[in-house]
Each structure stands twice: as C-alpha cells, then as structure tokens.
Amino acid sequence: MSGKLYIVGVGPGHHDHMTFRAKQVIEESDTIVGYETYVNLVKDLINGKDVYRYAMTQEVERAHQCIDLAKEGKTVSLVSSGDPGIYGMAGLIFEVLAESGWDPKSGLHVELIPGVSALNSCASIIGSPLMTDFAVCSMSDLLVPWEIIVKRVEAAAQGDFVIVIYNPSSKKRIHQLQLSLIHI
C-alpha cells in the first residue's frame, strides 16, 4: 500500500504568503513532518494529525521518516519554509528516493508544492524586483566547498548579474559573506 508525499513550501512565515494548494494538501494530510520551527508556522492547520518535529541538521532523518510513512499508506506533508525546491528539502527527498530505487510509476505519489521563496519576498519588501537576469548563490559550505562558492560568485559578478545571497552566515561561518564581497 502506498500513500502520498507532499513536499510543501509554506512561504516566508505568514499564512498570507502561503499558496492555496499548500494549505489544501496540509489539511488533507494524515501526517505532518518538518523542522520544528516550520511545523509551528502551520500549527493552526494540523490539529488532530500525527506530527513529527525535528531539530535543524536532521534533514536526512526527516526525509527517511516522511518517505517511510508515505510507503505505509499515509498522506504526508513535509513542510519547508519558502520554496522547498530552493535550498530546501525537495532535492534531498528525490535523492533518497532515487537511492532506494523509487519509480514514479510505482504507486508512491510524490508532489512538490512550491511556495513563495525568500528571494521573492525580500525583493518585494525592499522594492527591488528581480528583472532581466539574476543569480542565486548560497554562502553555506556544508555541501559545497568554499572555493566553488567563490568561483560561482565571481562568475555571477563577471556576468553583471544581480546576486541574491542565501545563508550569508551562521554560528560557524561568520566571514564568508565579507570574503565573497571582495570578489564582486
């Protein structure tokens, strides 16, 4: 028996910015899985549902949990902030599924529900529409070596792109943004 897995973008944090489809699939789901902060963003939509809350850095565990629940026949919403296809859980889910030999025709329905991303939201807030061409670069070197990040920022600057920067710093990374600005 196979269920459904929705990878749901809930937007930048307020229901006014969540899509109707995101609300709909969350309400239809038996089970909600997500990083605790993101689950709390939709707490008014999850009454009576099984909820699995995870800490930051437990992305792989989250991915396996929601896939396993969906394979058991449950309808699962994996909630992510912003858009789960932009530095979100979507890529990891599809990697885990591919490693397990998942076939989209196998019966396990997986659907990506886009959300309003931070880049859209921030551009609107500061009154700077992302027009013509732009590049998006993450300063996080957890999955990408710093040398590659610098190379990408330099290429975007060389191409005269507006550059949207994600993950400018963290507790362990406080100088990456300043170092990357040297290359622009």
Q: Could you tell me what each predicted segment is?
A:
Residues 1-110:
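Class I S-adenosyl-L-methionine
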Residues 8-9, 78-81, 113, 137-140, ...:
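Short beta-strand segments
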Residues 39-41, 59-60, 86, 117-120, ...:
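Short gly/pro/ser/thr-enriched loop/turn and capping motifs at secondary-structure boundaries
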Residues 182-184:
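Conserved small/polar residues in nucleotide/adenosyl-binding loops
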